[in-house]
Amino acid sequence: MREHLFATVDLSQQAGHPLSCTYHILIKDITEPIQCESYGVRVTVNQTGERKELPDITVLPDAVLKLVQQLAEGGVTPCTLRSVVEDWLI
């Protein structure tokens, strides 16, 4: 699996203490039954190392790019990532 760093966002003002999150796009090559790429996301809290990743969300690169942009803009943390992505998928 490959990864692409999308953004690092400072959330200190919202949290009231030093806090920043890094947002990555995860890329997995799929060869069967057709050759394509599957995309997911990972969010990491830089101060603690807490992280959550959700692979295989979509095969559409534009969709995962839009998703990770919304995650970064919204300051989504690892503990809320699954819920936010589930709502995004609906």
Predicted regions and their residues:
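Residue-level signal for well-ordered alpha-helical segments
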Residues: 2, 18, 41-44, 48, ...
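Mixed-charge, Lys/Arg-enriched low-complexity segments
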Residues: 50-90
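A generic structural signal for solvent-exposed, polar alpha-helical segments
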Residues: 10-12, 29, 45
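Negatively charged, low-complexity tracts enriched in Asp/Glu with abundant Ser/Thr
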Residues: 1-23
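Compositionally biased, low-complexity repeat tracts
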Residues: 12, 36, 70-71
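A short, structured beta-strand/loop element
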Residues: 31-53
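Amphipathic, interaction-prone secondary-structure segments
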Residues: 15-39
